[in-house]
Amino acid sequence: MLARLKKIQQKYQNLQQDLLQNQSISNKINIFKNLSKLEPIVELFQQYLTLEEQLTNITKALNQDQIEDKEILELAQKEKETLSQQKKVLWNQLRILLLPQDPEDQKNVILEIKGAVGGNEANLFAADLLRTYMKYAESKKWKVEILNLHPSIKGGLSSVELLISGQNIYSFLKYESGVHRVQRVPATEVQGRIHTSTAIVLVLPEAKEVEIKIDWNDIRTDTFNSSGPGGQSVNTTKSAVRLSHLPSGISVACQEGKSQHENKEKAFTLLKARIYNQILNAKQEAENKHRKSLVGTGDRSEKIRTYNYPQNRITDHRIGLTLQKLDIIMEGKLDFIIEPLIDATQKEKLVQSE
């Protein structure tokens, strides 16, 4: 690993030298991209080397009995212990930075939320989750575009599909896929009984044109009257669009746009993501990571997370994390959950790499 770090350091220095040469704009852009990827590793490695030098010097002084003052000697020994611990921490951080990255992590995502088991209460919870994700996206300065929205009675949502754009979005939101279980007293419950219901969240990496090629001859396009916010033309013109990909059997519809052209573009974005996800799932199936294990059917027993409102408690069952701050997290503070999930994933990868 040390040799690999030195190679990365040398590559970083070479790229810096390349910037001084008479490069084209496109070359400079690529160099800056590569530098930005390597910079966190190089900076941390430099900290590690500096700390290692300090540790070597103090160890040498202690071994050669160069310190005669007893009080200074005790301080030096404590300093050595502190530096040794810091060295271990930096080394583990470097190991994490060198772990293979998920190639999807830097992508935008399609986020889908559906009410599942529990009727209208499930749909109300789906609306609450949408609000949480919108607030989280706002805190990260991500752009959110609604592709499809199907409201239900009393302010609930039967389903919603969003396109979320920004930096490294999939690396954060990929942990949200699965069954989310809620335990609370519905507003309509006169006897105060706690009801359990679920919503399904699905997070798909957005597919780019270079990653997936779709022949329009394989797509059937249907138009129908929109029930969305299309102004006066709603229900009078066929602005809503349904795209059906015949080879895969995947069909998507979009009606949130104000024109047929806009809805067709949004539907195609959604269709690409679903086809791309199907391709990814085919690969994962070979590794026993089929999509159903990720998302499930919505049954209460398949939950990845439980939201207990009476006790203000949220539990992520994948890592056994329980927090008594449900109210805060539902205001968009999802990093309280997502960061421990990222840490757990990194630790698992470290164990696998040993």
From Swiss-Prot:
<keyword id="KW-0488">Methylation</keyword>
<comment type="function">
    <text>Peptide chain release factor 1 directs the termination of translation in response to the peptide chain termination codons UAG and UAA.</text>
</comment>
<dbReference type="Pfam" id="PF00472">
    <property type="entry name" value="RF-1"/>
</dbReference>
<dbReference type="InterPro" id="IPR045853">
    <property type="entry name" value="Pep_chain_release_fac_I_sf"/>
</dbReference>
<dbReference type="GO" id="GO:0016149">
    <property type="term" value="F:translation release factor activity, codon specific"/>
</dbReference>
<comment type="similarity">
    <text>Belongs to the prokaryotic/mitochondrial release factor family.</text>
</comment>
<keyword id="KW-0648">Protein biosynthesis</keyword>
<dbReference type="InterPro" id="IPR000352">
    <property type="entry name" value="Pep_chain_release_fac_I"/>
</dbReference>
<keyword id="KW-0963">Cytoplasm</keyword>
<dbReference type="Pfam" id="PF03462">
    <property type="entry name" value="PCRF"/>
</dbReference>
<dbReference type="GO" id="GO:0005737">
    <property type="term" value="C:cytoplasm"/>
</dbReference>
<feature type="modified residue" description="N5-methylglutamine">
    <location>
        <position position="232"/>
    </location>
</feature>
<protein>
    <recommendedName>
        <fullName>Peptide chain release factor 1</fullName>
    </recommendedName>
</protein>
<dbReference type="InterPro" id="IPR050057">
    <property type="entry name" value="Prokaryotic/Mito_RF"/>
</dbReference>
<dbReference type="InterPro" id="IPR004373">
    <property type="entry name" value="RF-1"/>
</dbReference>
<dbReference type="InterPro" id="IPR005139">
    <property type="entry name" value="PCRF"/>
</dbReference>
